[in-house]
Amino acid sequence: PRQGKAPGKDCIGNRPIHEEIDMKELGRIITLPKIFDPRGNLTVAEGETHIPFAIARTYWTYDVPGGESRGGHAHKECQEFIIAASGSFSVTLDNGEQKKTYHLNHPWEGLFVDVNIWRTLDDFSSGSLCLVLASHKFEEEDYIREYDEYLKFVSSKNSQNLSKTENQ
């Protein structure tokens, strides 16, 4: 798996962000700084400080009807950080071999999703707001929107990585 060093001084999970992290883990919850104040609390997420990439795009989903799901795709190059800014929802991550579901319901926590990971968001509570910080601007060619195509893509990537390892 690809290893990466995330620059900065804060935390990814419970580890300092500058330590090596396995960028192919099936998601990682990152706890962001919380500033408690009687006038209202504040949480901040800075790219390359609190999350392991520079932020190129921000988008959010809201008013998701009951029973509907979002996502249903993977990215070839774009990393994402998903936050339940309000309410709650579930995110199921799938690398073609295993799946893991996270329930997001705290605005001071987010889910880091690396490249080549299929994601599906569902179980949205009423009034929920899903905030996503992305490492790349929107490019349709970065998306894999069909699951069968995704499985072929990750199988090909895994074969390429195995060949590189054997040739070293």
What do these predicted ranges mean?
Residues 1-22:
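Short, Lys/Arg-enriched N-terminal segments with co-localized hydrophobic residues
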